[in-house]
Structures are given as structure tokens and as C-alpha cells.
Amino acid sequence: MSNHTHHPKFKTLKRAWKASKYFIVGLSCLYKFNLKSLVQTALTTLAMITLTSLVITAIIYISVGNAKAKPTSKPTTQQTQQLQNHTPPPLTEHNYKSTHTSIQSTTLSQPPNIDTTSGTTYGHPTNRTQNRKIKSQSTPLATRKPPINPLGSNPPENHQDHNNSQTLPHVPCSTCEGNPACSPLCQIELERAPSSAPTITLKKAPKPKTTKKPTKTTIYHRTSPEAKLQTKKIMVTPQQGILSSPEHQTNQSTTQISQHTSI
């Protein structure tokens, strides 16, 4: 309570309590003088004052308790300093050497395992594994970047093919007469003679043949009206010829004679 005595609300409560004391003393004096009506009004006012003061004190205690219960979200400066002090130092070459030497000393101090049955001795295989772990922890994995070839640059040629291929001297077979050592060279030269590079001819793709179907052509001749009349006359002329035949004439003459006789 000593911390909260300087709060302004507590000061007002103290003043209200003192005023209520004086008020009670005055009521007692009035009761002695038999003034009951005034005493009743004073008691009601005093009861109202006490109730309000109790409500105010309850609100103050609740607000103070909630403020204490809430944790601080942001860390203080002391906490940050403690965290910085507890962080381990980064791995340097000196630290790596010291740890490496300490591990070696511990491994050397351990005696090798001896089999009593076979009489063979063998060292601990943990040295290699521990050294590998330390190297993996100390040296980070180097990220290998693929070589970037600029545009238009040819890829590197394999020089192993040039080194592996042995160039034999060209020995003509005509000079190998009587030399037994020359004949295999001549044969090898013939086998390994560089053949002429084959010429690549690009064949053009044949165009697809399209077979066209023959179309029937109908020719229409225009005939003039004069030509039509000539064709009609040609058709009529043989009939006239038939009528003007000699047999027809004899028949006509006989009919005329018969007619004259009848008359």
C-alpha cells in the first residue's frame, strides 16, 4: 500500500473518510438535541457516501491487479544484454585448432582394444569419424556454380582424345621390301589410313504430286436462223425428188387418159 499512497484517487478517499468522521460526530450531537428528522436525512446521505467510496476502492484494486498480471511484450534492455552475453563465439581457426588438438589428445590417451583370444590389436575407428564431423562443422559446403559460357563460345574440347590417339609415321609399302619390321607398320598404316570424310548431300523433299481429274468440256455452237432454214430445205428436197420420178409421171399420164376416155 505504500507504493499506492501517492495515487490521487487514494487521496480523495482519505479526504472522504475524514469528512464522514466529522459528519458522524455532527449527527451524534444532533441526536442528543432530539432532532430526529435531521438525523434521518444525515444518515441516508452518509450511507450513500460510504457506498460510493467502497465502489471506488474496489475499482482501483481491480485495475491495479490487472496491470500487474499483464506481461510486458517488449523485452527490456537487461534481457537483451543477457542474451548477447550467452551467445557462443563464432568458430575461428584458433578455436578449431584447439578443439582438434583436444580431441586428438583424448583419442591418444585411450588404449587400443586388445583381443585376448586372437592376440590382435586394433585402434579406435572413432578418430576418423570425429575428424570428419569437425571438418564438416567448421568448413561450410562450398556452393559450386556451373561455368557460364558466353554466347557464341564453343564448348571445351576433350584433350584426352588427342592424347590417346597415337600418330604413326607414314611408311609406304614400296620401301618395306626385305625389312620384316616395316611390314606391320605398313599394314597398320593401311588399316588406320584416314578415310576421306563422307560428303553429305541434302536431299530435297519431293513435292506431293496432285492428280487432276480431266474435266469434260462441252462446246456449244451458235446457229444463225439462216443456217436453220438451209437445213430445213435440205430435208425437204429428197421428197420433191421422189415426187418427180418417171414412175410417178407415168402414173399421172395413165390417170389423165382414163379421165379423157370416160368423158
From Swiss-Prot:
Residues 72-86 have a biased composition (Low complexity). The chain crosses the membrane at residues 38-66. Signal peptide: none annotated. GO terms for cellular component: extracellular region; host cell plasma membrane; membrane; virion membrane. Keywords: Disulfide bond, Glycoprotein, Host cell membrane, Host membrane, Host-virus interaction, Membrane, Secreted, Transmembrane, Transmembrane helix, Viral attachment to host cell, Viral immunoevasion, Virion, Virus entry into host cell. Residues 187-198 are annotated as: Binding to host heparan sulfate. This is Major surface glycoprotein G. It comes from Bovine respiratory syncytial virus (strain 4642) (BRS).
